[in-house]
């Protein structure tokens, strides 16, 4: 829920009903601005326990458009980013070096495994598990979940060599995770129809 601000008293009141910017818990230092169309956009740094190449550590997440609908924050992939993923592919091996996108609806107990990174539906939530693609960093969380969903079980997943972003129901919730050593494979459970783009 948004905060309330009393300008005359210069006081902010926080709601008891809060939601996280991202449910992957890897993002920090969010930064906000407006784009050329006046949309509120945000980006943040991705926390990583080690450098993937031994040199640089951390990266910016995909810019997202922030909207409040019915008191709920939606964080949607910026349309200028989304339109870059226009060519259909059949496997990650066909993807450009900029990564790829997977769109799918997850039925009950449906799952997708992206090179060792698992996304699955559990009851009314979408969950992720990066334990197989996180180089045994046991000091960090590896399992994540959205709160109960209201808008369905659609996911748009943006895959990069060291970052996976799961947009659930066009931004109802988002899970961003740092990853290492992803395999170039994608598998889906029974009843999961998915489409890939690069």
Residue ranges and their predicted role:
Residues 1-2:
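Loop/turn-rich, solvent-exposed surfaces of beta-rich toroidal or solenoidal domains
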Residues 5-198:
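Beta-rich accessory regions
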